[in-house]
A protein has these predicted regions:
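Amphipathic alpha-helical hairpins/coiled-coils and adjacent low-complexity
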Residues: 1-10, 14-17, 21
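Collagen triple-helix signature
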Residues: 17-223
Length: 223
């Protein structure tokens, strides 16, 4: 049954989509069957700065796949869409943690933003937004480096048009600590903003906005 539709439309009639492979560049999850099937999860990325793979979307009935996690400093992948008739949206992936700074004035890397939560169709709950990654710590040396900023938490997906709760908002990543120096210290990284909760359908609960994360700390100068 799946062979003709796979050939013509590049998508099976029924069945779950395959999970995306993890690696230097995380691959997107496959879409679920046109009539029934869940979307595959996105793959996690490992190469610095690369976003995670997006979650696959469902067809008529099924849940969206989860977005893959970002590599260091990379954004999380977006969650897949829930089924047009019935199904929940996929959760967004988590942003990667920023790299730590090295040596004099070595600034920490910024954390990656979370992935968007997938929305539902007619009936179903929205996917949760991904959390932002923490910022990297500043390097230590003659002059300390600044900590990296935390990534932004992402929006939760909208609930189904008829019934469904909005997806929970992603939390922002914590700012990185400042590096210590003999002559001067670096600045602490800012915490990332929290995402907004997803809208509800005709019947359902809208989620609140997530709170912002904490700023990094500044340690005592070593001079």
């Amino acid at each position: 049954v799946n062979a003709p539709t796979q050939t013509l439309l590049g998508r099976p009639l029924v069945g779950d989509g395959a999970d995306g492979a993890s690696g230097p560049v995380g691959q997107p999850g496959g879409d679920g069957g046109i009539l029934w099937g869940n979307g595959g999860n996105g793959g996690d990325s490992t190469s610095p700065g690369v976003a995670g793979g997006a979650g696959g979307s469902a067809g008529l009935i099924g849940n969206g796949g989860r977005g893959g996690n970002g590599a260091p400093g990379g954004a999380g992948g977006n969650g897949g869409l829930g089924g047009l008739l019935l199904g929940n949206g996929g959760a967004g992936g988590v942003g990667g943690t920023g790299d730590n700074g090295v040596g004099d004035l070595g600034a920490g890397g910024g954390g990656g933003d979370g992935g968007l939560g997938g929305r539902a169709g007619l009936i179903g709950h929205g996917g949760a937004g991904g959390n932002g990654g923490d910022g990297g710590h500043g390097g230590s040396g003659k002059a300390g480096g600044s900590g990296g900023s935390g990534g932004f938490g992402q929006f939760g997906g909208a609930g189904g048009l008829l019934y469904g709760n909005g997806g929970a908002a992603g939390s922002g990543g914590n700012g990185g600590d400042a590096g210590t120096g003999v002559s001067s210290d670096g600045f602490a990284g800012l915490g990332g903003s929290g995402g907004r909760g997803g809208d509800a359908g005709l019947i359902g609960v809208r989620r609140r906005r997530a709170t912002a994360a904490t700023q990094g700390s500044v340690r005592a100068c070593s001079r």
